[in-house]
């Protein structure tokens, strides 16, 4: 099969996208597929894509222009089959505010929050503390990999956190900090149903699962022995399937939760999760006893 892997792009997550794309391409080539990689940052990438005439496109793009529905819209216009979620699901999951609204409407717990939609209308620190408690989280509304995220404990830290977050987006989420443990759930669509991969308890050296912890060697441990009850684990599965069905997730997705007192709180949905050799979803696939190459082929079959 002739497959084009789209990677790179211009978002702050470019480095991870390149690694994800190379891992996907190498794995599919090893299984006998004809695979080309194409960086969407090059000016004429659409022309190059059309010249390649792929049977299927495998987007490995993270962040803006990759997970926000734009590339999905382009591929739909060009009538090229592609792996993953459609425009609607991509738009919703890329926007942390919209994701939270869907979660609340679906009966899925999520940390309390304040939506900042205008840089000139930012609430006072003390108002935020009264509503969300201290510490609280400041993060861009539409950037992944915890880029621009800060844990705020004081008014002075709040100013610094706002400046950092506004570097990446003009819309922010101020979010309640729940001091629990982080769990990530991978799932993928196959034959009209969602199959849930083994959840991972992310053991991190600090209170925040930040960029360095996610992607640098030795940053975090992946533990499959979750310190929760069977009932709480079932809620993780139920919540994940429910919201992915409502949103319309396609291909594979990763959902991040914080768990406290047996209650999972949804943080975000990643419609194009990292696919590097060290990423969470490939690890979950291996732990489930599946071959990663076969898994990628299943995603392609679902797209065709």
Swiss-Prot record:
Coiled coil residues, start to end: none
PROSITE patterns (UniProt xref): ATP_GRASP, DALA_DALA_LIGASE_1, DALA_DALA_LIGASE_2
Enzyme Commission number, as recorded: 6.3.2.4
Keyword Coiled coil: no
Cofactor note: Binds 2 magnesium or manganese ions per subunit.
Protein name in UniProt: D-alanine--D-alanine ligase
The gene coding this protein: ddl
Functional pathway: Cell wall biogenesis; peptidoglycan biosynthesis
């Amino acid at each position: 099969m002739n497959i084009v892997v789209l990677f790179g792009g211009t978002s702050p997550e470019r480095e991870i996208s390149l690694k994800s794309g190379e891992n996907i391409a190498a794995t599919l080539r090893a299984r006998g597929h004809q695979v080309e990689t194409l960086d969407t940052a090059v000016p004429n990438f659409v022309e190059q894509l059309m010249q390649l005439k792929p049977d299927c496109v495998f987007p490995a793009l993270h962040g803006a222009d990759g997970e926000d529905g734009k590339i999905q819209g382009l591929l739909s216009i060009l009538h090229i089959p592609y792996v993953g979620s459609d425009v609607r699901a991509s738009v919703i999951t890329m926007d942390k505010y919209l994701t939270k609204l869907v979660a609340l409407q679906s009966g899925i717990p999520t940390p309390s929050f304040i939506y900042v939609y205008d840089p000139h209308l930012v609430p006072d620190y003390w108002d935020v503390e009264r509503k969300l408690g201290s510490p609280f989280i400041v993060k861009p509304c539409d950037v992944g990999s915890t880029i621009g995220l800060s844990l705020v404990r004081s008014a002075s830290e709040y100013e610094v956190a706002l400046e950092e977050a506004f570097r990446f987006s003009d819309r922010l989420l101020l979010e309640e900090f729940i001091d629990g443990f982080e769990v990530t759930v991978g799932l993928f669509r196959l034959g009209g149903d969602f199959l849930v991969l083994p959840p991972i308890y992310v053991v991190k050296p600090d209170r925040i699962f930040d960029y360095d912890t996610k992607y640098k060697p030795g940053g975090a441990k992946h533990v499959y022995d979750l310190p929760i009850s069977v009932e709480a684990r079932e809620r993780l599965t139920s919540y994940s399937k429910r919201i992915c069905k409502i949103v319309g997730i396609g291909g594979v997705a990763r959902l991040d939760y914080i768990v406290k007192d047996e209650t999972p709180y949804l943080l975000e949905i990643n419609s194009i999760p990292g696919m590097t050799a060290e990423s969470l979803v490939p690890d979950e696939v291996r732990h489930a006893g599946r071959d990663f190459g076969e898994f990628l082929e299943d995603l392609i079959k679902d797209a065709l």
